[in-house]
Amino acid sequence: RAGLHTGECELIGDDVGGMAVHIAARVADGAGASEIHASGTAYGTVVGSGLRFTALGSRELKGVPGSWPIMQLIG
C-alpha cells in the first residue's frame, strides 16, 4: 500500500519530515493491500498524464486540519 501527497518537506538529519510527509502517511493509512491512494493535491499534479484514478470521497486525516479529497490509482 502507498499514500501519495506533494508538498514541502524538511531534511532532519538522515530523515525527512514535515506536514507533506505526515499527510502522505495518513493517506496511506486508508489504502488496502496493493492499493495506491493519493491526496487531491497529488492528483492535481498528474491530471492529463494518462494515469487513471477513481474518487474515494473526502476524508479527515488524523492530525491534519480539514477534509481531504482522496483518489485511488487504478491504472
Locate each region found by the language model.
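Catalytic beta-strand-to-alpha-helix segment of the class III nucleotidyl cyclase homology domain
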Residues: 1-75
